UniProtKB/Swiss-Prot annotation:
DNA-binding region: 66-85
Molecular function, one GO term: sequence-specific DNA binding
Organism encoding this protein: Xylella fastidiosa (strain 9a5c)
Family: Belongs to the transcriptional regulatory Fis family.
GO-annotated biological processes: regulation of DNA-templated transcription
Alphabetically ordered keywords of this record: DNA-binding
Listed name of the protein: Putative Fis-like DNA-binding protein
NCBIfam families referenced in this protein's UniProt entry, alphabetically: PRK00430.1
Amino acid sequence: MNVVPSRPEVSRGSPKSPLREHVAQVVRRYLRDLDGCDVNDLYNMVLHEMEIPLLVEVLNHCEGNQSRAAALLGIHRATLRKKLKEYGLV
């Protein structure tokens, strides 16, 4: 089953963002490599696996400044700290 994007700007043929295309390639490769293995809760697993490097790289980009990192991510600093603690990154 193919999923057709419902957002008008995507369906009219505008180019995909490089990040979106890269994520799509990785997800396709992951699904292909499953080779029939059962996976449950793929959505949450993918979000979890993407969130950790996202937090680490943004924090590195902001030279450890959590306020700047939170602003760049568009989340409150307390939320960032909670996530860092949750993943054992602090």
